[in-house]
Amino acid sequence: MHLKRFLPVIIASFFFGCASAPVQTQSATSDVAQSSAEAQPEQELTLDSSNPFAHDNTLPYQAPEYDKIRTEHFVPALKFAMAEQKKEIDAIANQTEAPTFENTLVAMQKTGQRFMRVAYVFDNMTNAYTNDELKKAEEEMAPLFSAHNDEIYLNDKLFARIDALYNDRANLGLDSESMRLLELTHEDFLRAGAKLSAADKEKIKQMNAEISSISTKFGQNILSEMNSSA
């Protein structure tokens, strides 16, 4: 699994519905979301409250509750978490305030907290303690992770804010760490194709989805061979 430097986005490898009350998507950047004048209505995903990833746990540093997590929890939790992060990112990209380091870069750092919680556990399980159901989940999620990543890195409005900050970086009064974060973030967006034409971005999306699926299958084959020869 490969993590981008500046925010929790997964771009590589990666199911128990219960009748409890669902948890509604909540934004970790609610202050930004409230200021967004262009919020686009979408169907709200829900996550059953019986899913261990639906809420914070009592363990230190939100350590995974492996005794409660089952294979069937991952896909709904991951889909919910991606929708949650997309809502957070859209709020940042669509806000009317001029871009600042705080309302753009710092806000981006705060997105996808649930996604990271679920994805790290999922990645560890698929790499070290997998089974047939996890493999199916991994194959299902791989192109969705790729699409989620592209929705962020190919977001024109989001990149415009980052690009504006980058071009004015000498006047922002940033410390060395903040400056480095801005530079790396800008570089990551460029490498992901943020300045490509709309047509080329569509080609990139298709290639990324294919690479993600192939990489997932390749990783599964390697793990299978290692296990069979152990």
Specify the residue positions occupied by each region the protein language model found.
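Bacterial N-terminal signal peptides that target proteins for export
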Residues: 1-7
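Gram-negative bacterial Sec-dependent N-terminal signal peptides
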Residues: 8-12
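C-terminal motif of bacterial Sec signal peptides marking the signal peptidase cleavage site
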Residues: 14-17
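Zn2+-dependent metallopeptidase catalytic domains
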Residues: 19-230
